[in-house]
Amino acid sequence: VKAIDNQPKIASMDISLLQHDEETASGSGTPSLVVVGGSNSLLKNGWADKLKEVHPDSGRVLNLSIGAATSAMGLYRLLTCASLPDDPVIIWEYALNEANYFSHRQPAKVLIHHTQWFLEICARRGFRVLPVVLYNKSEAGSAEQVKYREFLARTFAAYGLKPVDASQLWRKDFGHLPVDRLYADNPHYSVETEFPLALARTVLQQSRSATVPQRGGDLEKQFSDKDLRIVFPDSRTPEPFVNRILSCDIFPLGTDLHFSLSGRLLACFLIASRMEPAITFHSDRGQKGPYSAQISAKAGGPVRQLKHLLLWSPQDPPLVARGDLFLSPQPSLGTTPMVQHTMAWNPLEEGGAPGSGGLIGLLAEVDA
């Protein structure tokens, strides 16, 4: 993969933005936008809210973001959305999240592979993509860069994509704004400055020149004979789950779940609670786990959350299934599960109340 130019061109904040209202009053050349990102894209009065304000038709901005997740969650949201607008530009905003997952021992190869799949799916559907690269406060105030970001930059360069870089925008047009005012906390930008609005305007302007990911050579070969599927359990009756962001079926984790799958297991999606068991995946080819399906029980925290588990690594390739795959809860006694970033583990009491969450589905790579 060729080296990236680490200085992508950021839209000027002077004449181009002064012309913003004039250019967009009629909506001419302004595409529909689908935002797929992390918690910064969900903040009230954050950059994604401002994007709806500056777009000439706010109804053409769809926000599919989920906090504390990675491109794997973006794939779930994209693949299961039944109401995508025509000919959208997909705004990918998972760099900050994935940098944090990388810092908590999630391999870059896993994160980048899922991001490549995200770009591959967009390319197959003819969707244009505009990455929006955000940074933690600790990164903005440091000369050192998280290693994951080098891999991400090379990935975007290989696909011919030019990201909007929030750090470059800050240094170019908001150099007067100290880091402590730019951020509300380490992973979240403040909504009390003009920066979110400026970022939104830059994203809107660059969305007009966004391109479909270009995959040639090795990238084309890498995915040419593969497809990606969301696989749901085919045993037991699901329970409905609805909140302000998501409506789906979930399958409680207290007993075995069966999946009809011939392929490779990459990840799973679940509604996690404070009382879920550890879970294991197994087929006739092997086993993965156990993994904690719990979230933190801290006071004031959420009771249930949409989460994902990333189920492979370079040293431990995806579990292969040849028709049948099972998820099984593990006994509480003696179980010390793997606890991934943003998850938690507190051993369950025997005979205790069952969890209120459940599995949604699996992310699997299959042969086309």
Predicted segment positions?
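Generic detector of low-complexity/intrinsically disordered segments
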Residues: 179, 221, 230, 248, ...
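Alpha-helical cap/lid subdomain in secreted, periplasmic
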Residues: 53-57, 73-212, 272-282, 287-367
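Charge-rich interaction segments
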Residues: 190-194, 201-253
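Histidine-bearing beta->alpha loop at or near hydrolase active sites
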Residues: 65-70, 186
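Short beta-strands within extracellular/lumenal beta-sheet-rich domains
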Residues: 240-261, 274-280, 307-310, 357-358
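Serine-esterase "nucleophile elbow" of acetyl-processing enzymes
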Residues: 2-67, 77-86, 258-261, 267-282, ...
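Short, flexible loop segments at the rims of nucleotide/cofactor-binding pockets, characterized by
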Residues: 10-12, 67-69, 108, 140-141
